Amino acid sequence: MLFHGEYTAYIKSGGRVQEAVGKNRRMERSSMKRKFLAMTLALAMGLSLAACGGGTASTPAPAETGEVEATTPAETGSTGDVITVGFAQVGHESDWRTASTKSAQDVFSAENGYDLAFVDCDNDSAAQLEAVRNFIQQGVDYIIIDPIVSTGWDAVLTECEDAGIPVIVIDRTIDDSDKYVSWVGSDFKVEGLACGEWLKAYAADKGITEINALVIEGSVGASATIGRTDGFKEIADREGWTILDSQSGDFTEAGGQEVMESYCQSYAGQFNVVICQNDNEAAGAMTAMDNAGVTYGVGGDVILVSFDANKPYVQMVMDGKINANFECNPMAAPTVAEIIQQLEAGETPEKEIYVSESWFVAEDNVSTITVNGEEQECIYVTQEVLDARPY
């Protein structure tokens, strides 16, 4: 168990760990970059002098850039003390994603001895692969990937491996687990199981004997979508619940509203549970149900459940608009920084590290649930609980 301020990371070992790349190897790459820069400057000066002797030199046109913009890491100093980190982020589709990005920018700051090259891939998997390859060309010391999809990574991870750049995966997972150093994130299936176990206990307490659920899934192919779907479906199948429909809202508010509007038309009066796989989808679903005259939350006709538990949506739990919200902790960056420091010291980090998470509920009738044989607390949201939320 590792402690990172307010956050606890649960560790699970397994798989082949890529060879640790420490300070000496990083300094070798830094030295190579400095030599290359010196050669480039020398050549540029020579060309400049030749141009001055032979007439006027034309101003070169700026190089064309792709659609993906990134902050470029500065050259490391002569001591190689600054650690350059490339971060290929999924995008900016949700409040959770914004919190994840801010965490990385805060942790990998100049004040902390880092130079962060950040790329918002805007949910474009091809752009994400390009971003990682650009990081390799830039010669960063470490690469962080929050993968848009879990497949198609073998070639680019092999390129990272060949370049001697350790890769750390956060949040979502990828299939090529032998080609990255560590993964830091959530157990998405456990989140789905917890949702199902809470709903089972809540329905029993309220005397609800029939569950007819609608699910608004996240992005197709994302490990968060797969895990939450599989976990909830496992409980639904066991309990004999009906899942009327399940469609992707792409983890966005607009997507959640669009899917829920369709549901309100197709299943009017037939559903009593809506499961949204993130907070932004829940916001869209609430708008659609408001427009359709469907009541939800505490005292409503529909039990509304969300995932992520960003602070504004935990507020909605306290207000009774959302019945339960299952946290997905976006603060992976402190744990990633610890992994980097382990690699710098020549140590081998754990392969899988799970961040701690909590389950938030609007009523105090279900205080605990059992998930995979482990009793877990359901936190009744009060103002004190809300004030303590860091994001």
Regions found by a protein language model. Give the residues of each.
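Short, low-complexity disordered leader/linker segments with a strong preference
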Residues: 1-84, 110, 158-165, 375-378, ...
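Hinge/cleft segment of the Venus flytrap/periplasmic-binding protein
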Residues: 70, 74, 81-83, 216-220, ...
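Hydrophobic alpha-helical segments within soluble ligand-binding/sensing domains
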Residues: 78, 85, 128, 184-211, ...
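Extracytoplasmic "Venus flytrap"
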Residues: 84-111, 116-134, 140, 146-150, ...
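Short, solvent-exposed amphipathic alpha-helices that sit
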Residues: 96-110, 114, 191-198, 223-241, ...
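Short beta-strand elements at the ligand-binding edges of bilobed clamshell
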Residues: 118-120, 175-201, 246, 319-330
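Hydrophobic alpha-helical
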Residues: 137, 141-162, 232, 245, ...
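Flexible loop/hinge segments that line or gate small-molecule binding clefts
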Residues: 151-190, 212, 310-318
